[in-house]
Regions:
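Hydrophobic faces of well-ordered beta-strands that scaffold small-molecule active sites
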Residues: 51, 163-165, 193
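Acidic-glycine-rich active-site phosphate/pyrophosphate-binding loop
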Residues: 5-19, 248-264
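Conserved N-terminal subdomain of the carbohydrate kinase-like
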Residues: 48-137, 326-331
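Active-site beta-loop-alpha junctions enriched in small/polar residues
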Residues: 108, 137, 168-172, 198, ...
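Conserved post-catalytic alpha-helical subdomain immediately downstream of the catalytic base
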Residues: 262-330
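Active-site metal-binding loops of divalent metal-dependent hydrolases
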Residues: 9, 167, 281
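Glycine-rich phosphate/adenosyl-contacting loop at the front of the ribokinase-like
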Residues: 1-76, 95-98, 115-118, 271-272
């Protein structure tokens, strides 16, 4: 099986431990980005995955490409920018007790934001692909990325390749712009929608909050509403319950419109080490198990367990293997 993801690669910088961003004498670095995180997680779950992006032709771009190669991700379709391009950055200040986690983006004018949508040969990229995954972050980054994304989804649909869209609402990237005019047309073309109630409300305009997933009946109602409005075959919604400063309840639901099957996962109580990448690892594991032919309920339980494991390790990438996830499921 082969999957393809498309989005921006970022360099993440974080202070160690619980230190504050501008009060620490050092910053730890790693690479990330929603779609890159999905590609890495898929690779570790045994799915061959190619990642499509654009990075600068400089040492930071070189390091990013090499980091992906080390994780087993295909980098053939990564374009290189000119000498004046830059790699997008983001800074993460871990939260502690009453202090919430803080994220600061520095990605305006990046090599990816300046992407020429006509520079990607999507028929060649998607030839032989069994799945195509994107996120709602890309449309916020500029006209080039959103045009490339629309062209990619159109190409995938024409080829009969399943498309998943993780809504991934990032308020700071939209800068008070309304995301709905860009996101809703993409959502109507994606066969699988992934997100949480906050993203559903902000990006698709449906009334949804934490209470929407509080009972199976409410969760199913929201999923059916999403499926009917956007003609999606599957709806996956994650739920994060804050039980303490670093204690979270983590669960999800999955609705299959073709069979009208609805599944609700068990709730994992997780001591969170790093919450970044949790949703991405959920998306990756769900894709991996649907590609493997699992029934929706089994695929959902696997995805929730895999993403719960990701919450226990630092950094953006999930390196959980199938065996590790299955061991957790047996526990």
């Amino acid at each position: 099986m082969r999957a393809v993801t498309f989005g921006e690669l970022l360099l993440r910088l974080s202070p160690p431990g619980d230190e504050r961003l501008l009060e620490s004498p050092e910053l730890h670095t790693c690479f990330g980005g929603a779609e890159a995180n999905v590609a890495v997680a898929l690779s570790h779950l045994g799915v061959r995955c190619d990642y499509v992006t654009r990075v600068p032709d400089n040492p930071l771009g070189d390091a990013g490409v090499e980091a992906l190669r080390k994780e087993g991700v295909g980098t053939r379709w990564i374009a290189r920018g000119g000498s004046g391009d830059r790699l997008g950055l983001y800074f993460v200040e871990p939260g502690a007790d009453l202090r919430a986690m803080r994220v600061v983006y520095d990605r305006a004018g990046s090599a990816f934001a300046r992407l020429d949508p006509h520079s990607i040969d999507w028929p060649a990229v998607l030839a032989g692909a069994d799945w195509f995954h994107v996120s709602g972050i890309t449309p916020a980054l500029g006209e080039g990325p959103v045009a490339a994304l629309a062209g990619a989804i159109a190409c995938a649909r024409a080829r009969g390749t399943p498309v998943s869209l993780d809504l991934n609402h990032r308020e700071a990237l939209w800068r008070n712009r309304n995301p709905r005019p860009l996101i809703e047309p993409l959502a109507r073309r994606a066969g699988v929608l992934i997100g949480n109630t906050g993203a559903v409300s902000a990006m698709l305009g449906l009334a949804a909050d934490d209470a929407s997933l509080a009972t199976p009946e409410r969760a199913r109602g929201l999923a059916e509403q999403l499926s009917a409005r956007f003609e999606a075959k599957r709806i996956a919604l994650t739920r994060r319950e804050i039980l303490g400063p670093r204690e979270h309840g983590w669960s999800a639901v999955l609705y299959d419109a073709e069979t009208r099957a609805f599944a609700q996962s068990r709730r994992h109580r997780v001591h969170v080490v790093d919450r970044v990448g949790g949703g991405d690892s959920f998306a990756a594991a769900l894709i991996a198990r649907l590609l493997a032919g699992d029934r929706p309920a089994a695929a959902l339980e696997f995805a929730v367990a895999a993403s719960a494991l990701k919450l226990t390790v630092p950094g953006d990438f999930s390196r959980a293997s199938v065996e590790e996830v299955e061991e957790l499921l047996r526990a």
